[in-house]
Amino acid sequence: MDNALCYLQHLKDERQFIFGILNDNVREINIEKKEIKQLREYVGILQQNGFTGDELVSQMEYIMKIKNIKKLSSQYDMNSAENSSGTYDFSFIGNELTIFRERLSNYSSWGVMHYIPSMPESIYIYMNPIHQTDEVDIVYQGSNDNYSYLIKKNGRTASYEHQITLNLAKDAVKKHNLREATEQRIVNNRKVNFITKYTEVTTNGKTDQLAVPLFLLHLVKTATGYKVSYITIKIILEEQVESNVNIVEIDTGVEMTNAEVNAIITGLLSRMMMVTNFVLGNSMVHRRMLRQFIGMQVKVIEGAYVINSQKGAGSNLLSGIYGQGVIATLSSLATLLQSTPQTVKSNYVLNGIHTNDIEQKDMKRQFIFGILNDNVREINIEKKEIKQLREYVGILQQNGFTGEALVSQMEYIMKIKNIKKLSSQYDMSSAENSSGTYDFSFIGNELTIFRERLSNYSSWGVMHYIPSMPESIYVYMNPIHQTDEVDIVYQGSNDNYSYLIKKNGRTASYEHQITLNLAKDAVKKHNLREATKQRIVNNRKVNFITKYTEVTTNGKTDQLAVPLFLLHLVKTATGYKVSYITIKIILEEQVESNVNIVEIDTGVEMTNAEVNAIITGLLSRMMMVTNFILGNSMVHRRMLRQFIGMQVKVIEGAYVINSQKGAGSNLLSGIYGQGVIATLSSLATLLQSTPQTVKSNYVLNGIHTNDIEQKDMKRQFIFGILNDNVREINIEKKEIKQLREYVGILQQNGFTGEALVSQMEYIMKIKNIKKLSSQYDMNSAENSSGTYDFSFIGNELTIFRERLSNYSSWGVMHYIPSMPESIYIYMNPIHQTDEVDIVYQGSNDNYSYLIKKNGRTASYEHQITLNLAKDAVKKHNLREATEQRIVNNRKVNFITKYTEVTTNGKTDQLAVPLFLLHLVKTATGYKVSYITIKIILEEQVESNVNIVEIDTGVEMTNAEVNAIITGLLSRMMMVTNFVLGNSMVHRRMLRQFIGMQVKVIEGAYVINSQKGAGSNLLSGIYGQGVIATLSSLATLLQSTPQTVKSNYVLNGIHTNDIEQKEYEKTIYFWDS
C-alpha cells in the first residue's frame, strides 16, 4: 500500500492526484502494469476478508473510483459490473459516515449550531445513485408527517425506495397544502425529472414550502421543530455549468435535531467554501480556483457520485496547502445503501482516505484519525495490542492512577483504539470502582485525544468538520447537578496538576489528574501561587480555587495554571449560563506548555447559544490554519506554534495569550500577509492586579512586539492606533506640529473647508486625540459655510483589493456560519444631533440616495449604479417603504423607494433598505463586478472603519459574489465573534485586527453598529449591535465621481507592514 502511495505522490502533473483522486481528464490513461498489480492485490485483500460477488465488485469500483481508473479489465468494467445474480450492488461506499454518525450520537453538543445564511439558494436534495444511461424520475410524495421519494430507474422503481422522515412538530403545524412542481434538468447528458410533491406548512403563522425545488434547506435552517435522519446537499456553483456540483449525502441512522443537522451542513459547506473564501479575491485566479476546489465535476459510477476536480485542479493549491489526499472523504460522504442494507458485510477502511497520514499495510485494522472503522470493532485483539494496553496500565499506575481513574484512562485508550473489550478487568460495560459502583464521570478527556492526535500525525490532514472540536478541549466537569454547590480545586505541583470536584461532599470519588509534562530542561523555577474566585453559576456558588505553578522558562515567567473554567460546562449543560469562558488547548505532546488560552468575560450572563457562538468563533479561528496547512508535514509544527501554539501568561489570574518569540513573522507574511491575524496574541485583557490603578495604558508585551518597534511605550501604536485609555493624554508640541503638517498636506491635495476638517478629525481619531484646538474640535467642526460635512469615510477597501490582487492566496477567510440577521444600512456622515432621512430613489437601472440633514439635502447626494443585466430585467414596479430606527439616540428614517424587478419569472425587491443582499443571494439573473462593504466597528470612533472593495474586472455569478462576501465578512467578523464581549478591551482589539489602511474616496456609505455594540452583541448570539455588514454590492460613488480627489493612505494601519520609525511622518500617497 505504501508503495502505491509513494508512486501516486510522485505522479507527473498530468496524472496528479488531487485529494487522492486522479484528475478527471486523465481517466482514459492507460493503466500501467504496476497499477493493475496493485488493484489485483486489493482484490485479494477483499476476498480474504469475505467480499465476494457484487460486494467485491462494488469494493473494487470504490477503489477504482479513488484512483479514477475507468477500466481495470472487462471483469471490473465500471459500466458492466454485475454480480452473479445480474443485479447491481452499491452498498459499499467506504462508510466513513459510521464514524461521523458515532460521533454525532456520542456527543451531546456538536460545536457549531448555526446555519449558513449566505450559501447559494440552490441547495437541494438530489438523489445520486443513478446510472449514466438512466432516465430518472425523482418523485417526492408528501403527507402530513413524512416525505418519501422514489427513484424510477428504467422501471426498477420498487427496488429503490427511501424514506425521508420529517417528523414535523405536531403542535407547530397548523395547515398542510400539497403542492407539486416538476423540473427537468440535463445532468451528465441525461434527463432527470425532479417531480416534487411538497407540503406547504404553516408554522407559527409562517408558511414554508418544505420542498423547493426538491427539499428546502429552509426546513433545516429555520423550522425548529423538524428532525431528519437523512441529509443530501447539492450545490450548483455556476449557472452556466449546472452539472458542476457538489453532492454530499449523510445518513446518520438516527433522527437528528436541527442543531445536529446544522452542524453537519455547516461543517460540510464550510469545508467546501473554505478555499473560495480566501482565493476569490484574486481576479486572475478565482474562477479557476473555484472550479478546482468547489466546482467539482460529477462522476457517476453505478450510482455512486464522485466529486472529481477538473483538469489542472489545484496541483499547486491543494498539494501545497492540504497535501495529497487530505479532503478525500468529500467524495464519499454519502451512504449508498441497498434496499436491503442488512446484507452489508463488515465494512472497513479502504485506501484513499487520508492516505498521507496513515500507513495502510494492514487494511482490516486501518485507522482513520486514529480510530478504527466502527464495523471492525469486534475483531480479535492481537497479543501485541493486549501487550500494548497492559503497558499503558503500567504507565498509568506509575503516574498515580488507581481504581476508577485507572479504569477511565484505560477506557479512553480503548476508545482511541476502538477496542470493545480488553479483559473483564477493563471491560467498558463493567467498570467498577472500589466501592463496587459505576462511575463514568471521567468520559475520556477528549483533550487527550486532541493532544495525542497532534503528536501522532506528522500531517493532520483535513480536520474535516471540526466545529465539534473533539467534544472536549476541556477539563470535563459535566456531572454537576443543578442544585450542587461545587468547589473546583486545582492542586499544583512542579510537574502536575489535579483537580477535585466537590459535589455535596462526594469529593473522594471524583478526582482526576492532569499532567502537564513540562519540558524539564526548560523549567528553571517553580513558585506555587493560589487564587480563589467564586462565581454564581445558575444560582449556585462555584468556587474556583486555583493552585498554579509559576514557571520561569528561558528567563520568562509563565503561570501554567489549568484552565479556570470548563468548556463542557458551557457546551453541553444547557441550563447553565456563564459570563466567563476560558479555553485551553494543548496542541502538541512534545511541548505541552505550548498552549492557547483564551479568556473572555462579557460582564453579563450568556445563554448557551451565545456562548457557543463565541466558542465557535474562537475554535474555528484557532483551528483555521490547521484546517489548511497541516497537510504539509514539513511546516505544520512550526506554523502551529506560530499561529496557534501561543504560550500562556497569567497576570494575577487573568489569562493572556502571548505569542512566542518570532511568532507570526514568517507565518503571517507567507500565508496571510503581514499583520493579518495580529490579534490572536491579545485576546485577553492585559491588566494589572489592581485595574483601578492602571496608568495611562500602553501596549503591554506580547502583542506582536516583533512587528513593532516600541521605543516609546506610552504612545505605542498598535496598528497605528493609540490605546483607547490614552485618549486623554496631553498633546505634545510635536504632535500639534505633526497635525499641522497634515493640514498642509491635505490642503496641497485640494482639501478645503469641511472636507479638510473631516480629514483632520479622522487623523485625530486615528491618534486618539480628543481635541487638537478649538479650530479642530471634533464637536464643533464647521466649514466656512457653517454647515457640517462628514462625507469622508476612509475607504480602507482599496487596501483589501490591493492585497487580494497581490496575494495569490489570501489565507483562510473561513466561513463564519452565523452572520447576523441584523444587517441594515446606516449612513455615517450624520452628526449626532441631526435627524436624518435616508431616501432611496429607484429607476430601472440605477438607485440614488439622498441624505436629508436638517434640510441640507442637495449638498449630499450619491449614486449607486446597479448595472442590471438588461436582458434579465422584465418588469419594474416601484415600491416604497419607510422604517424609523433609533441609532445613537437619534431618529433615522429609512425611506426606501425600491424597484420590484421580475427576473426570469421571479420577483425580487432590489433595495431593502438600500441594496438587497437578496439581490446577490437569490436573483440568479443579476451579475455584478464590483462589491463594496464597509463596517464601522465603534460608535465612538465612527471613522474607524473597514471598507472592503473588490473589483474583479468581470461580471460575477451570484455564487462567486456570495463566496467573496462570505470570505470578506467572515474575516471582518472574526474578531467580533469572540472579543467584542469583553467591553474593556474590544475597542483596542478591533482596531488592532480590523483597522485597515485608509484610502480616501470622498463620500461613501458606512455601516455602524447600534448603541452598546459589545455587551449587547453577545446577549443574543449576535443580537443587536453586531457589526452590521453589507452596505452595497455595487460601486459606492458620489453623484459626480470624477471629482474624487487623489486618494492616499493615512498612517498607522497595519503598521507592521509599514516602517514606523517616524510615526508622525508616515504618510503614503498615490494617485487614484
Curated annotation (Swiss-Prot):
The organism's place on the tree of life at top rank: Viruses
Protein name (database record): Uncharacterized protein S3bis
Organism the protein comes from: Diadromus pulchellus idnoreovirus 1 (DpIRV-1)
Gene: S3bis
Coiled-coil annotated spans: 21-48
Keyword presence, Coiled coil: yes
Keywords: Coiled coil
